A protein has these predicted regions:
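Acidic/His- and Gly-rich active-site-bordering loop/insert found
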Residues: 1-87, 91-110
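General secondary-structure edge motif
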Residues: 11-15, 174, 229
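Acidic-residue sensor for enzyme active/binding pockets
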Residues: 19, 24, 121-122, 234
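Histidine/acidic-residue-rich, glycine-tolerant segments that coordinate divalent metal ions
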Residues: 52-55, 74-87, 91-92, 107-226
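Hydrophobic pocket-lining residues within nucleotide cofactor-binding pockets
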Residues: 71, 135, 232
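Single conserved hydrophobic/aromatic residue that forms the stacking wall/gate
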Residues: 229-236
Length: 236
């Protein structure tokens, strides 16, 4: 009887080795070893990155299907110390795909099944690196998934169209004119300008049926408490 891998046990292992985008060395090694132990053809360092792909080939011609999971963790600061944490669930995605690999390794009769473990989903660059590496060149169907804590497990959710929009990061530097807080009319406070930008971005009249979101996720400004701020940096 075939022994399938337990996704929970895989997740427990992966959850203890969170790594940031393009730094998933331990994770990639864990994935590659697991695939190799299953007897699955394994490609590593895809496109010169930490990307890994397992390939299960059927004995007859047929479609090429690719299943994809991301591997990277998110950067956090705890007690003043930077660290990586699997706060977006990519460890569970990787665990689930490895569990699928153990179930599918003897089930593919026609065509080919590719199992892609992508680096740097959070940094966006990972997807481009995988495309440049040619992982999609012969693929007929590509599928992926993402856990949703707000979604009931029993219900599930499948969408034939767009479910999540692509992301883009914008960095804005605002330069003003410093002045004493008691005489704000003599300066240009970049905090005020930054707040105005944030409010106006949120006030854009987009079609509510469209999938979109625009958010300021960081705001940095440094000055003495008695002076208006000369420079501010926004990220969104």
């Amino acid at each position: 009887m075939t022994q399938y891998l337990d996704p929970v046990a895989l997740w427990e292992d992966l959850h203890q080795i969170p790594e940031l985008a393009m730094q998933e060395v331990k994770t990639a090694a864990y994935v590659a070893k697991t695939l190799q132990d299953l007897g699955i053809e394994t490609q590593t360092q895809l496109g010169g990155t930490t990307g890994v792909m397992g390939i299960i080939r059927g004995s007859e011609p047929g479609p090429v299907v690719m299943l994809r999971a991301d591997m990277d963790a998110l950067p956090f600061t705890i007690d003043g110390k930077p660290c990586a944490i699997h706060a977006c669930g990519h460890d569970s995605h990787t665990a689930m795909l490895l569990a699928v690999a153990s179930r599918m390794k003897d089930q593919v009769k026609k065509g080919t099944l590719k199992l892609l473990f992508q680096p740097a989903e959070e940094a966006i660059s990972g997807a481009l690196a995988m495309i440049d590496a040619g992982v999609l060149e012969d693929v007929d169907y590509a599928l992926s998934s993402h856990i949703r804590p707000i979604q009931d497990v029993e219900a599930g959710k499948v969408c034939p169209g767009v479910m999540h929009s692509a992301s883009h990061t914008m960095f804005v530097e605002i330069e003003g004119r410093s002045a004493h807080a008691a005489r704000p009319h003599l300066g240009v406070n970049t905090i005020d300008v930054a707040c105005a930008i944030i409010q106006n971005v949120q006030a854009q009249w987009f079609n509510p049926a469209d999938v979109w979101s625009a958010k300021c996720t960081q705001l940095h400004a440094d000055a003495a408490v008695s002076y208006t701020h000369l420079r501010a940096h926004e990220t969104g």
